[in-house]
Amino acid sequence: MNIEKKTFVNEDEKNIFQEQKEALKSIFEKLDMSKIAFVGGIADYLNLRSYYDMPVNDIDIIYENEVDLLPIQEQYGIRKYCTRFYSMEAGEVLVSEYPFNNKKIHADYYKRNFSRIKLTQSPLLGKMVWHASFTEMKEFHNKQVPLITSQAMGANYEWKRLYKHSKKASLYNNVCYLEEKNLLQTLKNNL
């Protein structure tokens, strides 16, 4: 486990931008990590880093109780926005900004019932964190693609959003395909 953890720390150092590392460091220090979980780009990174060399582009976090975000609210402030892209329980996203070298790194917080999402734990920058599982994120990206096409979205269509979900769905689907192919080859060799 220590060798694997060290390898992942090296991977994390390489694939996570310095600004995001600083924001994550603040999150690790301020929040109870047992009361939040990562989704979005960080969950994708954690689920796929053994297969692909991919950067982390955003920080998306789910929580059950807004009171658990108070340490962030008190130090950095949190603003509420309506979310039109994802069907969420509260219909809103909370956003905090972490200043670093004249830049602001955004973290998005979504209210979710943890019992309705498959979570798992993995090391991130040497800390164990909860995040959406491989299966959960694969299903999410595959379900998002038909919902965000130009035909489905009309005037709200964003090609970058469709591209992002299509690409991530393909990465997850490819991993599953390769694992199934390897399993079939192993079975064939054992017969």
Predicted regions and their residues:
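General structural signal for secondary-structure boundaries
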Residues: G40, I62-D68, Y98, S133-E136, ...
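A generic structural signal for short, non-catalytic loop/turn and secondary-structure boundary residues
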Residues: L31, M54, F100-N102, L124
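Active-site nucleotide-donor binding segment shared across nucleotidyl transfer reactions
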Residues: L24-I59, E64-L70
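Catalytic cores of NTP-dependent nucleotidyl/adenyl transfer enzymes across multiple folds
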Residues: I3-T7, N102-L191
